[in-house]
Amino acid sequence: MQVILLEKIVKLGSLGSIVNVKPGYARNYLIPQGKAKRATERVIAEFETQRAELEKKQADILDAAGAQAAKLDGLLIQISQKAGVDGKLFGSVTSANIAEELCKQDFAIEKSMIRMPEGQIKQVGDYTVIVVLHNEVSAHITVSVLGETTN
């Protein structure tokens, strides 16, 4: 199925690209999410008239993500979890815990935006985590996991 992309999609194309995708991907994801429209002659002509407006909207979103990345980059957050004597956590620190902590600090971050290269954190220590704010913008934060020992 041919679709016209309304925004840049990683590994697929950029704004205004006409690409062939599987029908299910178009019907179930791209079109409902507002990321693409079916590529008919009428839609293509309509898109060309709105291209400048859509490009400006995408640039504004990118600028906002860049501004938020500047605030986030290098940020240190501390999370306390119960841990044993050897520093091993009872449970783990997940992307949901990190997103919750960032929301407490007035950042609009969802758990799906957080990438943890080392997987879930199961030991006390400092870890670098990536926050993906946009396809092209990400920030690196440091998560310091503190152990609360129980007696």
UniProtKB/Swiss-Prot annotation:
Q: Which organism is it from?
A: Nitrosomonas eutropha (strain DSM 101675 / C91 / Nm57)
Q: Which domain of life is it from?
A: Bacteria
Entry's family note? Belongs to the bacterial ribosomal protein bL9 family.
One GO cellular component, as annotated: ribonucleoprotein complex
Q: What is this protein called?
A: Large ribosomal subunit protein bL9
Record's PANTHER family? 50S RIBOSOMAL PROTEIN L9
- Sorted alphabetically, which Gene3D superfamilies does this protein's record hold? Ribosomal protein L9, C-terminal domain, Ribosomal protein L9, N-terminal domain
Q: Which keywords label this protein?
A: Ribonucleoprotein, Ribosomal protein, RNA-binding, rRNA-binding
What's any GO biological process attached to this entry?
translation
